[in-house]
């Protein structure tokens, strides 16, 4: 029977001023009929009775923190710093931003890469002289001939 004995739980209690009975803190009234007044209601009643002064108004209102705004100082140093920051941001704008969220599909990424390659490809042989082009073509022909001969042996 000792194993099944319930564990004693201590509750937060308050005592009733009329009957000295222990009542749970969450209860607003005692079984004897006494009603506990909450601190919020007590403070509200006090503020209704006495008109609050300018100091009490600030205390009675809930304190709200406001965002502190810094004043901008007009100086050439600050302007130079702003210009530097802007120039950096412009240089970063060249990079393509990655899309946020879940990617649509893998094929869309491949299409983007192909587009980038097409845009980046520049004809490096456009400014090539005829003599250089002939030398390169002869070199390529020799390389191709060697590769073909290797395949025939295997």
Swiss-Prot record:
Keywords: Coiled coil, Phosphoprotein. It holds the Pfam family UPF0547. The keyword RNA-binding does not apply. Residues 104-132 form a coiled coil. It comes from Homo sapiens. InterPro entries: C16orf87-like (IPR040246), UPF0547 (IPR018886). Residues 43-119 are annotated as: Disordered. Residues 68-84, 109-119 have a biased composition (Basic and acidic residues). Belongs to the UPF0547 family. Transmembrane segments: none annotated. The gene is C16orf87. This is UPF0547 protein C16orf87. The modification Phosphoserine is found at residue 91. The keyword Acyltransferase does not apply.
């Amino acid at each position: 029977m000792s194993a099944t004995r319930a564990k004693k739980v201590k509750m937060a209690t308050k005592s009733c001023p009329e009957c000295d009975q222990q009542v749970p803190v969450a209860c607003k009234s005692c079984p004897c009929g006494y009603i506990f007044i909450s601190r919020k209601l007590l403070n509200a009643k006090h503020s209704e009775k006495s008109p609050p002064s300018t100091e009490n108004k600030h205390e009675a209102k809930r304190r709200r923190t406001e965002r502190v705004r810094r004043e901008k100082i007009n100086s050439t140093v600050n302007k130079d710093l702003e210009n530097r920051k802007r120039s950096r941001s412009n240089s970063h704008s060249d990079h393509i931003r990655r899309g946020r969220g879940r990617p649509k599909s893998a094929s869309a990424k491949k299409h983007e890469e192909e587009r980038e390659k097409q845009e980046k490809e520049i004809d490096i042989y456009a400014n090539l002289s005829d003599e250089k082009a002939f030398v390169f073509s002869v070199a390529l022909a020799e390389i191709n001939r060697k590769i073909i001969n290797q395949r025939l042996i295997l």
